[in-house]
Amino acid sequence: MKAKRFKINAISLSIFLAYALTPYSEAALVRDDVDYQIFRDFAENKGKFFVGATDLSVKNKRGQNIGNALSNVPMIDFSVADVNKRIATVVDPQYAVSVKHAKAEVHTFYYGQYNGHNDVADKENEYRVVEQNNYEPHKAWGASNLGRLEDYNMARFNKFVTEVAPIAPTDAGGGLDTYKDKNRFSSFVRIGAGRQLVYEKGVYHQEGNEKGYDLRDLSQAYRYAIAGTPYKDINIDQTMNTEGLIGFGNHNKQYSAEELKQALSQDALTNYGVLGDSGSPLFAFDKQKNQWVFLGTYDYWAGYGKKSWQEWNIYKKEFADKIKQHDNAGTVKGNGEHHWKTTGTNSHIGSTAVRLANNEGDANNGQNVTFEDNGTLVLNQNINQGAGGLFFKGDYTVKGANNDITWLGAGIDVADGKKVVWQVKNPNGDRLAKIGKGTLEINGTGVNQGQLKVGDGTVILNQKADADKKVQAFSQVGIVSGRGTLVLNSSNQINPDNLYFGFRGGRLDANGNDLTFEHIRNVDEGARIVNHNTDHASTITLTGKSLITNPNSLSVHSIQNDYDEDDYSYYYRPRRPIPQGKDLYYKNYRYYALKSGGRLNAPMPENGVAENNDWIFMGYTQEEARKNAMNHKNNRRIGDFGGFFDEENGKGHNGALNLNFNGKSAQKRFLLTGGANLNGKISVTQGNVLLSGRPTPHARDFVNKSSARKDAHFSKNNEVVFEDDWINRTFKAAEIAVNQSASFSSGRNVSDITANITATDNAKVNLGYKNGDEVCVRSDYTGYVTCNTGNLSDKALNSFDATRINGNVNLNQNAALVLGKAALWGKIQGQGNSRVSLNQHSKWHLTGDSQVHNLSLADSHIHLNNASDAQSANKYHTIKINHLSGNGHFHYLTDLAKNLGDKVLVKESASGHYQLHVQNKTGEPNQEGLDLFDASSVQDRSRLFVSLANHYVDLGALRYTIKTENGITRLYNPYAGNGRPVKPAPSPAANTASQAQKATQTDGAQIAKPQNIVVAPPSPQANQAEEALRQQAKAEQVKRQQAAEAEKVARQKDEEAKRKAAEIARQQEEARKAAELAAKQKAEAERKARELARQKAEEASHQANAKPKRRRRRAILPRPPAPVFSLDDYDAKDNSESSIGNLARVIPRMGRELINDYEEIPLEELEDEAEEERRQATQFHSKSRNRRAISSEPSSDEDASESVSTSDKHPQDNTELHEKVETAGLQPRAAQPRTQAAAQADAVSTNTNSALSDAMASTQSILLDTGAYLTRHIAQKSRADAEKNSVWMSNTGYGRDYASAQYRRFSSKRTQTQIGIDRSLSENMQIGGVLTYSDSQHTFDQAGGKNTFVQANLYGKYYLNDAWYVAGDIGAGSLRSRLQTQQKANFNRTSIQTGLTLGNTLKINQFEIVPSAGIRYSRLSSADYKLGDDSVKVSSMAVKTLTAGLDFAYRFKVGNLTVKPLLSAAYFANYGKGGVNVGGKSFAYKADNQQQYSAGVALLYRNVTLNVNGSITKGKQLEKQKSGQIKIQIRF
C-alpha cells in the first residue's frame, strides 16, 4: 500500500490502523517531561545543538539533568535532509535517498533555509527530481519482509545541491551485527517531519473512527521536524532480521501506557516515528571514521497499537553505483583542445559520447562528464546537458565557438587545487551551480543573463566588456553553504543588489573594489564581506531602501465579501480577479497585507488571529490599516545585515575595508548583528546605525508547546526568543565617523567595540544599552526585523556584560556621546557645545588627559587612569570639564610619595554629588595631602558636594580622608605630618586670607604640594554627630537631589529658609553641641593647664632622681605643652568647605609649636621601664568606654596610641623595632586638643589596624589568659589534694569584644583545651604539668585572623603550714597566626611565661576563703611578615603582671556527693608595651589592667571532681568579656 500526499484533514487514519503491519512509518512521538522546544532545537541544529557542539546535556521541565542527547560525540548536521519534509537525504551532490512508497512526495525538495524569507526567493534553493530511481521498481511493497527490503529509492536532482555538503553513507554493508558493535557505531539519531504526537496519559489521538490512546496530536505532517534517538536495542525480535534492514525495539511487544513512557525515557531525547516520516533518515556515528554517516531511510513501523518497533532500509551501495554508472558518460583525458560537438540529443567530446537533454522533461537523459589532465574544451554549439554536470580534475579553459554560446547543466565541480577558466554563458534564468574546492574564473565577454550559485571553492568574476563596453558576469549570484568565496575583479561584474547570501552564506571578496548596496540580501549569520586585497582599499556603501513617509500613498484593493447581510445578489455577481502588488486588501470589513510569497486566493485570518502564512491583519479602519502597513513595510526595509565584515584575526589577510552608511533619508535605519574586524573606517553620513548582538537561534514553536518563557516582544510568526539567551558580537574598525545629524548606536550584547570615534554636526553616538533603547531582532526564517523600546527586565539586563569600547572620542559642533551599559577605555576631546552623558551602568577609563565641555553623570564611574592598579601606573591623567552635573564616582590612582596623582579640574560650573575613590602606589606616603578635585574657578559651588568613598582610603600605614577648601578637595591625614616640624595653625581669618592669595593650580598630573590643613576630617570612629552626618551623606547619595540639598546646607555659610525642617533641626542641634563643647573645652583646658604644670614639675623631679637603667638609654622628650584655648576661636567664622559640619569649624588656637627634635627609645628597653609605666598608669584619667565620644582633653589616656610617626630608618631586625615617645608621637601635626586630633585607631589603615588588632588579641589570649587560668588552677588546689596524684582536663570558651584608641573595634572567639597532671611529692609539696592548646578566630575591621597556640607549663606548690603556700611556674609555647585582609599573611611567634604566687587558706566551718597575690612575667617574640605590599614588623611583647585574688567556697554534702559552690575575684595589673611598624611607621599598643569575676560549682564524687564555672573580665580595652569552663579531675 502506498502513501497519498498529506493534506490538512485529508489523511484517513483508519486505513493505516486497519492493518497491523503498515508501511506508513511516518512521524514522531516524544516524551512529555522534556520541554518540546528541546526536540525542536535538536532537529534544526539550533540552541545548544549547533553543528559540532559537544555539550548536549538535557534537562527535564523541573530543571533536572536527565543525560545527554548524544554521548561523547559531536552534534550532527541535519541540513542534509530536505528542510520541509525531511524525507530526502543528500548522499551525493546530485542524489538523495528516500523510500519508493512515498513517491507522491518525491518530486521537489528545498535545502537550507525554510521557504518565505524576504531576501531569498523560495525557488533559489529548490531542487526538482528528474528521476526517482526506485529500487526494484516492478516489485510492489507488501506485508512480507521482502517487500520492505525493496522500499527504497535514490532520486536524481536537476542541479548539484549547493546549500549543503553531502553526508557520507555507511560502507559497512547491510549486516546487523556490525551495527550492534558499540566500538564501531556508538550512537544513532533520527529526524522526521511527519505527524507530531506527544505521549500523554489519558488522552487519545483520533482521525475518523480510529483512536491512538495516550497520545496527543500536535500537528499534521510536513509542518516542522522533530529529532532524537531511536529505541536502544536493535531487533530484539530476531524474526524481523533481514539483511539490509535495521530495526529498533521489539516487534512482538505491545507497549502499555507505562511501558511506552519507559521506552520514550530510555535516552534523553528518545522518540518514536509514526505517521509522516517515510523516507526520513537514520544516522550513525562511525568511530572508525570519526564522523557521522547516513545509515538508512525510514520504511516501516509497528503501528499505534504497539508503539514498540521501527525500521530503516540500509543504504544500498551497489544500487547507487549502478545509477551513477548509468548517469556518467565517461572521462575525457589528455592535454590539448577538445571540441564538444552535438547531433540532436547525442554529442561527442572526441571519442567520448555524451547523452544530452532535449528539454526540461528529459533532463535525466543528460550525462555527467569528467575531465582529467589539463586542456581546453570548446563548445561548438549550445549545450543542454540536462541533469548532467561537468567534473574537472585538472586545469581547463572552457569556451564557445563564439561569445554567445551557452551551456546548461547540473553544475560544475572543480577539484581542490585546480582552476577552470569559464568563457561561456548560461541561458537566461538558468542557475549555474559551482561545487568543489577548486577555482572557477568567469572570463566571458559581454552581458550574461544567466545566474550563479557558489556552494564551495572560489569563483572569480572577471567578465570582459563587449564592443559596447557592457559587462555582466551574471544577472544574479548566490553564495551559500558557508564554504564558498566569490571574488570580484571589478565593481561592474554584477549589480550588488542582485547578489545574495543564502543558507550559511559564504565570502564576498570585494578585492579592492567599491560596491554600493541598497540592501545586502542575507539569510543568516554565515554571510561575510571581506577585502583580501592588501594593496587597494574597498568601500561598501549602504543606502537602504526608501522609506514610506505618507501612509495615504498606500494602495488599497477591495475584495468582494464572502457574505453581505443586506445584499444577497453578490452570489450572482461575477468574481473580479484580485490584482497583485497592492499594499492593502479590504475584505469582510477588515484590511490585510499580503506577505512576501503569499497566495492571493489563500484564506485570510479571522476570529482574532493576526496572521497566517499568507496574510497579515492590519486594522479595521483605513487610517489605522495604512499607518500599520506603512510601519510594517518600513520595518521590512531596515537595512539589516546579520553577517560579518572582513576576517577574524588569524583567518585570512585583511585588506582595508571601509563601510559607509549613507541612507536615502535621515530616518533610514541600519542594523548590524554579525560583527566586524575592519582595517578601514566606518562612516555614517545619513541615517541611524545600530550595532547589536542577536538572540541565540531557536526553532519556531509552531504549536505553542514550549514550556519555556519566551520574550513576547519577538514571538511573531511562532519565533522563539529568550530574553536572557543572546549571542555577543564584537566590532572593530580603525575609525568611526558620524556627522550631519546622523546617529551611531550599540545595543545589547555588543561585547566589544574597538575604534577611534569622531562625531560632528549634531551627530549622536550612543554606546551601550540603556533602558528605553531600541532592541531589534531579525528573524532567520523571514528576514523580518522587529524592534521594541520597552525596558529590559533585570534578568535580561544582567545576562550580558557592559560593552567595552577601546578608542578615543572626538566631539565637535554640538555632537553628543551617551554611554549606557558600557565601559569606555580612551580619551575624550570635546569642543564647542558637545555633550557627554554617562548613565547608571557606565564606566569611563581615561587613557590620557581629556577635556569635556559638558559632562553629565548618573551614578556613573570615571576611572581617571587606565592602569590596572596603582603599582603599574607610570603616568597620571587630568580631566578638564567646563560644566559638570549629576551624581557619580571618580576613581584615582596616586603616588603620594612623589606628590603625583590623577586630577579632576572643573572650570565654569559644577553641581551634584561625587564620590572619590583613591588607590595609592606601594610605598609609604610622605605627603600630608594631595589635590584631587579642583573646582576653585567655579563661582557658584553651592550645589557641589564631594565625598570620599567609604569615608576614608588606606594608603600605606595610614588612613586618609579628604578636606575641601575654596573648591579644592584633597587627600588629608593629620598624622602624615608627624616627624616633621609643623607650623602653628593659623586663625580662621588668616587662613581665609592665605587661601584667597593661593597660586593657580597647574592642570597637569604633577600636583603642587598643598599647604597645611589643621582641621581633622571625619572618620568611621567619630562621635555621634559625625556618624549622623555620614549616614545622612549616604542617604543623600541614594536620593541624589535630597542629598545634594542636605550637604549644601551643611557647608554653606549663608543658609536660607528653604532648608528642610529636618536639616534645620540637625544643624541647630550641632550648633548647640558645639557651644556646649566649647564651654567644656575652655574649662577643661584651664584645668589641664594646671594639671600639666603639676605633672611637669613632678616629672622633672622624678627624672632628676631617677638613675638610668642602661648605659645606652636615651633621653626622653618631655611632654608637649598644653594647648591654649579661647572661646573666640569657636565664634570665629570658618571659610572651609569641609563636610564635617559645624564641629569641624571649632578650631582652637594653639599655644606654641610642637617640639620635634627628640630621639627614639628602642622598644626592648621599654621592658626595663616598669617604674615609668606605673607613673603613666596613674598619670592620666581613665577614658570613656565609648571610643567614639569626642573628648575635649588631649589624648593622654593610657588607652591612647603611643606613636603614629615615621622612623627615619628601619630597624635592623624585629627586636630593634622602635617606638616613638609617648605623647609627642601621638599628636597629629600641632599638638591639638582631642576634638581635632583623631585617635590612632581612626588614622591607621586596614593593614595597620589588622596588625595592631592581631598583636593585641595575641597578647590577651596567649600571655594574659593562659597565665590567669594557670594561676587559678594552682590557687584552687587544696592541701588535701597534695596527698594524692591526679590528672585533669578542662575546656574553656571565650567570647570577647575589644575597643581602644589604639585600634578599631573587633571581636574574638577562642576555645582553649588544657590537659594536666598533678603529682604529690610529700604532704607539703605538689608539682604538676599543663599542656595548653587554643584556637582563636578574630573578626577585625574589614579583616580577619586566626591563631593556634600550644604551650607547656610546669609548676610547683609548697605549703608552709596548713594555711600559707607559695607556688611557682614556668612555661614555653608556640603561636601560629594567619591574617586575612585583601591579602594573606602567615607568621609564627614563641612565648615564655613564669610566675610566683603567695596565698593563704582560711577555713571557717564549711567555708573556705583563699586570698592570693603574685607576680608574673610573660613574653611573646617578635614577628616579621608581608601583608600585601606592606612590610610589617611586630616587636616582642613583654608583660609584667601583679595579681591579687580572692576565692570563696562553701562545701556541703548531698549523700556521697560533695558540692562546692565557688566565687572568685581577681585583679591583674599589667605593665607592658608592644609596637608594630608598617611601612616605616611605628605604632604602639598596651596591655591594660583587668578585673575578673567568676562563679561556679565543683561536684566531688569519690575520686572524680567536675568543675563548671563562668567568668566576666573587665578592662579598658575589653568591652564584653565572657568565658565558660568545664573541668574534670581524677585523683589516684
UniProtKB/Swiss-Prot annotation:
Domain Autotransporter span(s) in chain numbering: 1280-1532
SMART domains: Autotransporter
Top-level EC class as recorded in UniProt: hydrolase
UniProt superkingdom: Bacteria
EC numbers, comma separated: 3.4.21.72
Protein biosynthesis keyword on record: no
Compositional bias ranges of the Polar residues kind: 989-1004
N-terminal signal peptide: 1-27
UniProt key word Kinase: no
Disulphides: none
Top-level taxonomy: Bacteria, Pseudomonadati, Pseudomonadota, Betaproteobacteria, Neisseriales
Domain Peptidase S6: residue ranges: 28-322
Site (Cleavage): residue numbering on this chain: P986, S987, P1018, S1019, P1121, A1122
Residues at the active site: S278
Keywords of the record: Autocatalytic cleavage, Cell outer membrane, Hydrolase, Membrane, Periplasm, Protease, Secreted, Serine protease, Signal, Transmembrane, Transmembrane beta strand, Zymogen
Reactions mediated catalytically: Cleavage of immunoglobulin A molecules at certain Pro-|-Xaa bonds in the hinge region. No small molecule substrates are known
Entry domain remark: The signal peptide, cleaved at the inner membrane, guides the autotransporter protein to the periplasmic space. Then, insertion of the C-terminal translocator domain in the outer membrane forms a hydrophilic pore for the translocation of the passenger domain to the bacterial cell surface, with subsequent cleavage.
GO terms under biological process: proteolysis
Cellular component GO terms, alphabetical: cell outer membrane; cell surface; extracellular region; periplasmic space
Region (Disordered): 979-1136, 1166-1217
Name the record gives this protein: IgA-specific serine endopeptidase autotransporter
Role summary: This protease is specific for immunoglobulin A.
Biased amino acid composition, Basic and acidic residues: 1045-1101, 1207-1217
GO molecular function: serine-type endopeptidase activity
